[in-house]
Curated annotation (Swiss-Prot):
<dbReference type="InterPro" id="IPR016009">
    <property type="entry name" value="tRNA_MeTrfase_TRMD/TRM10"/>
</dbReference>
<dbReference type="GO" id="GO:0002939">
    <property type="term" value="P:tRNA N1-guanine methylation"/>
</dbReference>
<keyword id="KW-0489">Methyltransferase</keyword>
<comment type="function">
    <text>Specifically methylates guanosine-37 in various tRNAs.</text>
</comment>
<protein>
    <recommendedName>
        <fullName>tRNA (guanine-N(1)-)-methyltransferase</fullName>
        <ecNumber>2.1.1.228</ecNumber>
    </recommendedName>
</protein>
<dbReference type="InterPro" id="IPR029026">
    <property type="entry name" value="tRNA_m1G_MTases_N"/>
</dbReference>
<dbReference type="GO" id="GO:0052906">
    <property type="term" value="F:tRNA (guanine(37)-N1)-methyltransferase activity"/>
</dbReference>
<keyword id="KW-0808">Transferase</keyword>
<comment type="similarity">
    <text>Belongs to the RNA methyltransferase TrmD family.</text>
</comment>
<comment type="subunit">
    <text>Homodimer.</text>
</comment>
<keyword id="KW-0819">tRNA processing</keyword>
<dbReference type="InterPro" id="IPR002649">
    <property type="entry name" value="tRNA_m1G_MeTrfase_TrmD"/>
</dbReference>
<dbReference type="Pfam" id="PF01746">
    <property type="entry name" value="tRNA_m1G_MT"/>
</dbReference>
<feature type="binding site">
    <location>
        <begin position="133"/>
        <end position="138"/>
    </location>
    <ligand>
        <name>S-adenosyl-L-methionine</name>
    </ligand>
</feature>
<dbReference type="InterPro" id="IPR023148">
    <property type="entry name" value="tRNA_m1G_MeTrfase_C_sf"/>
</dbReference>
<feature type="binding site">
    <location>
        <position position="113"/>
    </location>
    <ligand>
        <name>S-adenosyl-L-methionine</name>
    </ligand>
</feature>
<keyword id="KW-0963">Cytoplasm</keyword>
Amino acid sequence: MWLGVITLFPEMFRAITDFGVTGRAIKNGLLELHTWNPRDFTHDRHRTVDDRPYGGGPGMLMMVQPLKDAIQAARTAAGDGAKVIYLSPQGRKLTQRGATELAETQKLILVCGRYEGIDERIIQTEVDEEWSIGDYVLSGGELPAMTLIDAVSRLVPGVLGKQASAEQDSFSDGLLDCPHYTRPESLDGLEVPAVLLGGNHEDIRRWRLKQSLGRTFLRRPELFENLALTDEQTRLLAQFVDEMDSPQKS
């Protein structure tokens, strides 16, 4: 997968290129990540990248010419088929389903805003889609871009090593993840559930699914609004609720 980022702070993306899952994927050639700094496309000795908004008001906007030229340079490097995304509070909220859709795109160019944002005409002429990571204010688009890159990269074949890891993540099937345990078997008086020690793979699968359903029911019940539960899921959720109401049955 090819990724381009338009940012005033390219050094921030070392968190993506040098560390963790994405760093390994880049090293192994599964991902490419390139950055373009609008400051490199300025024509004044101060390398100015901000400008006053028409109509007045507080703050500044990113200057049009350096930003537009940086996007064009990224498009040229990407070649045909690149999708330009602006990280914006007005955009579609990123979910696991959205990340899966974006992972099917082979080339993404992410535009990171700063100051009070960018000129609306840049959005109209240069941007294909706007995406948001949530309803809160950040200082720029870099952290949302890194979040999107990490979420999408995990879905690129080979990045996680085992595709099952991505398939079992929270939200991959619309549900929260089940609880996980490692050694020791007993920790401060709390025991690993016996089913996980028994070695019966089908029992373990059902337990994990039931816990996933139950955790979603308790913590994010609104997620069920977009799900059509199977007969097995409906039965396991009912068991979870029954056991929660009657602990002696568990």
